[in-house]
Regions:
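Glycine-centered flexibility motif
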Residues: 31, 79-80, 100, 120-121, ...
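Short, electropositive, low-hydrophobicity segments enriched in small/polar residues
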Residues: 35, 39, 45, 69, ...
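N-terminal beta1-alpha1-beta2 submodule of the flavodoxin-like/Rossmannoid cofactor-binding fold
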Residues: 1-62, 124-156
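Short, flexible, mixed-charge acidic loops at enzyme active sites
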Residues: 8-9, 112-124
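Short, glycine-/small-residue-rich phosphate/pyrophosphate-handling segment
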Residues: 64-117
C-alpha cells in the first residue's frame, strides 16, 4: 500500500561544504576522482542526482578530455562493486572524460582477497562496516590516485 501523503524525515542535502561539489568545481578541476557507496549494484542516489544536474557542462563540453577515475565500497565481496563503478563511469564517458582504471601490472589486483578491480578502486567494508582498507586496497587506491594525478599533470 502506498500512502497519499509523504513527510520528509531526513534533512535536505546541503548545497555546499565538503564533501559536496558544485558544477563550477567540476568545470575547474584538472582531474576527477568520483566515489560512491554501492547501493544494490549502483551508485548512491545523491550522486546520481548530482550527475543528472551536469547537463550544462555536457552541453558546453566543459569536461571533455579531463581524466577521471571512480571508486566504491561495499559490504560484501560480491556486493556489486564492478557494476557500481561502471554506473558511475557512464555519465563521465558521456561528458567525454578520459576514464582511468587499474592495470593488471599491479599484482595486488590479481591476488587480492578484498577490494580492487580494473574498473577502479574498491573496498569491502564487511557487515560491520569496517572503514579500514586492507593492504591491497590501500596499495591499489594509492596507485589509482597517483595515476590520475600523473595523467592530469601531463594533460594540463
Amino acid at each position: 500500500m502506498v500512502s497519499a501523503q509523504c513527510e520528509a524525515v531526513d534533512p535536505q542535502i546541503p548545497h555546499e561544504g565538503p564533501p559536496y561539489a558544485t558544477l563550477d568545481d567540476l568545470k575547474s578541476c584538472h582531474g576527477l576522482a568520483l566515489g560512491s557507496p554501492t547501493r544494490f549494484g549502483n551508485m548512491a542516489a545523491p550522486l546520481k542526482y548530482f550527475l543528472d544536474s551536469t547537463t550544462s557542462l555536457w552541453l558546453s563540453g566543459a569536461l571533455v578530455g579531463k581524466p577521471a577515475c571512480v571508486f566504491t565500497s561495499t559490504a560484501s565481496m560480491h556486493g556489486g562493486q564492478e557494476t557500481t563503478l561502471t554506473s558511475m563511469s557512464i555519465p563521465l564517458w558521456h561528458h567525454g572524460m578520459l576514464l582511468l582504471g587499474l592495470p593488471y601490472t599491479h599484482t595486488e589486483l590479481s591476488e587480492t582477497l578484498t577490494g580492487g578491480t580494473p574498473y577502479g578502486a574498491s573496498h569491502v567494508a564487511g557487515s560491520d562496516n569496517n572503514p579500514h582498507l586492507s593492504q591491497d586496497e590501500s596499495t591499489l587506491t594509492k596507485a589509482l590516485g597517483r595515476r590520475l594525478a600523473d595523467i592530469a599533470l601531463k594533460l594540463k
